[in-house]
């Protein structure tokens, strides 16, 4: 079954399936080219977004995620402060370094295609990735699927699932459960709190100290996201020119003489949520 580290993931927003997943797919495609010795022969890459990725991709920053993935960047280690600049540079220069090393011509407007009428039968979030040589011949082409939660899969993985592949995760935990009722039943039988039982399950995957360190890292990223949202003034990305609201509201709360009063707790929660949303 899934680990808490599969559920709580570091990555760019706004969507795990339409942003994190496509970014991982782009990077995985580059890995496939390297594995086959085709990266240096690649002169062009064409990305076709299908199904929901095409229909709602622009609003979920899917093209941005595709570019970042082709650059070889990872959601877990991406610097959000430089991501937009990296994507803008590709659009401006018309060049992209595949995997961060191999330079090709790349125009996001032409080389990322929105196939609105192509609705896949296997899964609604599909990306067809194709690499071409200098003569225009196809070197390698593969369709991947963003299955939700940042998970990705090839067609073969979905058609012939393997045990423990995280798309069809194996039930290998010490206390497996598929519902809240089953979870609470385990807790009652073992006289354990929910967090104790979950940690026992995590210890089937890795040492406790490693899990705790990873969760601490995720918590730090969450707090950093809030902090950036509270301190970054200006206008949100996009053509509407929407002004960021969180910084002004945060300063108003800080300066309020009753900033620690109980009735303002929800105001603080709201401004933190707004800060994350605007990030």
Show the residue positions of the predicted features.
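Conserved phosphate/anionic-ligand binding catalytic regions in large, soluble enzymes, centered on
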Residues: 8-26, 59
């Amino acid at each position: 079954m899934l680990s808490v580290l599969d559920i709580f993931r570091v990555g760019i927003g706004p969507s795990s399936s339409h942003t994190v997943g496509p970014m991982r797919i782009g990077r995985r495609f580059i890995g496939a080219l390297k594995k086959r010795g085709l990266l240096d022969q690649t002169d062009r890459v064409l990305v076709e977004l299908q199904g929901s990725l095409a229909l709602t991709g622009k609003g979920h920053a899917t093209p941005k995620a595709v570019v970042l993935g082709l650059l070889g960047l990872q959601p877990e280690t991406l610097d959000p402060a430089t991501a937009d600049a990296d994507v803008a540079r590709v659009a401006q220069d018309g060049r992209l370094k595949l995997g961060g090393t191999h330079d090709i011509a790349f125009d996001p407007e032409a080389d990322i295609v929105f196939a609105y009428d192509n609705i896949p039968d296997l899964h609604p979030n599909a990306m067809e990735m194709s690499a071409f040589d200098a003569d225009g011949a196809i070197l390698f082409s593969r369709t991947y699927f963003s299955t939700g939660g940042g998970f990705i899969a090839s067609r073969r993985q979905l058609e012939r699932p393997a045990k423990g592949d995280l798309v069809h995760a194996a039930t290998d935990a010490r206390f497996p459960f598929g519902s809240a009722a089953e979870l609470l039943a385990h807790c009652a039988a073992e006289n354990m709190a929910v967090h104790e039982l979950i940690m026992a399950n995590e210890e089937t995957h890795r040492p406790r100290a490693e899990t705790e360190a990873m969760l601490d890292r995720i918590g730090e990223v969450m707090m950093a996201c809030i902090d950036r949202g509270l301190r970054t003034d200006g206008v949100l990305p996009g053509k509407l020119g929407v002004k960021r609201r969180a910084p002004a509201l945060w300063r108003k709360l800080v300066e309020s003489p009753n900033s620690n009063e109980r009735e303002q707790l929800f105001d603080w929660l709201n401004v933190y949520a707004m800060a994350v949303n605007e990030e």
